[in-house]
Amino acid sequence: MSGRRQLNRRQQILEVLASELEKNLGLPITTSSLANAVGVSEAALYRHFASKAKMFEALISFTEESIFSLINKILDQEADVTVRCEKIIYLVLSFSERNPGITRIIIGDVLLGENERLHARVTQFFERIESQIRQILREANLSNGPRPISNIDAVADQIITYIEGKLSKFVKSSFSKKPTEHIEVQWSVMKAGYFR
């Protein structure tokens, strides 16, 4: 029972941290304020996480596991390159829309002054998505379906830049500009420019 309670408390801490990041836009989250929001002492927080960086790391891991397991499902279910790209874009944007506090972490908004390892993790997160898109585009070049009309690296870079820009705009607008807003029209324009 103690192990389950530990897991539940860890989960509670992470959920409250994500909620506090959403509510306190532009403000740093201290371990003291987080402990107060969770309803425990700072010492209790440190029994579950060695540092605030470890809490951020746990939320980054959650994001990676969620996104990449769903990307794998998309790849298993869809063969068309344009559908794969569209669904991956929508997946990342809608995940962020549902998790605004976590979005602040993955775009680095709350990582100023934090451990460089955290910055590397979020950079790697976007690099993995870009790499996956690049692989999809390479495979498309070998198929009879739609193919990228330009340099694969340039197309993958443009798609990941679009995603990062939408997430940044979401945070900078105090979460009022939803990442999925206008996605159908924007993807239609991008698709026409990227594929033949």
Label every model-predicted segment.
Residues 1, 61-87, 139-141:
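Amphipathic alpha-helical linker/stalk segments
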Residues 1-37, 54:
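Basic, helix-initiating cap at the start of DNA-binding domains
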Residues 21-24, 30-31, 42, 52, ...:
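Amphipathic alpha-helical segments enriched in hydrophobic/aromatic and basic residues
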Residues 65-68, 72, 116-143, 153-157, ...:
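Amphipathic alpha-helical packing segments from all-alpha helical-bundle domains
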Residues 94, 98, 131-139, 157-162, ...:
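C-terminal peripheral helix-coil segments that are non-catalytic and often amphipathic
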Residues 97-117, 168:
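Amphipathic alpha-helical segments used for helix-helix packing
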